[in-house]
């Protein structure tokens, strides 16, 4: 992966065609994310805790949009992000970003129609749920119960991505589940910051003195 990254960086630097440079930059981002995934695979089983903090979902959504919207546009498919939770969550931004990237990439490769990433309040009001769905054929009924097991895949892939995403969600105190298999709807459940502790509400705007 290091050699591939160096080659992509070289192409991005020496190419005079904007389209080639843009494609090289996109590929480089994918390689960097894959490197992170491999690293997580090596140590996720050793980590029992995660450095979580108060983050805004829109920050994670904006990063995901920047990474994926061009690829969805090239495929002629809409990618929609909607934050109706409108409150900070307690999560690890890097891990949450990788979980969403796995779900979005799978939707792009194997799904169809509009891919929607929707954050909303959980039923308990103490958490936030992020749903990733599309309008494709979905997941075979026989695979659904074991979809997060390593090696389980209905599309000839390694079957590592969803298993890792499941572990990453757990590592930051969240939960990744398959809500429905047809149409495919995955949910990521995360603890929300109570309104009484929300720094945007507790701390007044402007200077303190």
Region locations from a protein language model:
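Conserved micro-motifs of the catalytic ATP-binding
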Residues: 47-51, 88-91
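Conserved catalytic submotifs in the C-terminal HATPase_c
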Residues: 73, 78-88
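Short helix-loop "hinge" at the ATP-lid/N-box region of the Bergerat-fold HATPase_c
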Residues: 106-108
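Short beta-strand/loop element within the Bergerat-fold HATPase_c
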Residues: 114-126
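Acidic ATP/Mg2+-coordinating residue in the GHKL
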Residues: 134
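Short conserved segment of the HATPase_c
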Residues: 139-151, 203-204
């Amino acid at each position: 992966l290091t050699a591939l990254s160096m080659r992509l960086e070289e192409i991005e630097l020496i190419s005079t065609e904007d389209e080639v440079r843009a494609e090289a930059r996109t590929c480089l981002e994918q390689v960097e994310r894959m490197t992170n995934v491999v690293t997580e695979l090596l140590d996720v089983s050793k980590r029992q805790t995660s450095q979580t903090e108060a983050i805004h979902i829109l920050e994670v959504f904006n990063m995901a949009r920047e990474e994926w919207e061009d690829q969805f546009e090239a495929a002629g498919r809409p990618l929609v992000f909607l934050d109706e939770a409108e409150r900070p969550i307690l999560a690890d931004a890097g891990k949450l970003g990788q979980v969403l990237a796995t779900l979005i990439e799978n939707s792009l490769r194997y799904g169809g129609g509009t891919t929607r990433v929707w954050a909303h309040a959980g039923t308990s009001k103490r958490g936030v749920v992020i749903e990733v769905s599309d309008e494709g054929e979905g997941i075979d009924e026989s695979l659904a119960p074991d979809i997060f097991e390593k090696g389980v895949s209905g599309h000839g892939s390694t079957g590592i991505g969803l298993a890792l995403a499941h572990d990453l969600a757990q590592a930051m105190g969240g939960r990744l589940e398959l809500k429905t298999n047809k149409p495919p709807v995955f949910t990521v459940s995360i603890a929300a910051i109570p309104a009484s502790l929300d720094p945007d509400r507790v701390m007044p705007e402007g200077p303190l003195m």
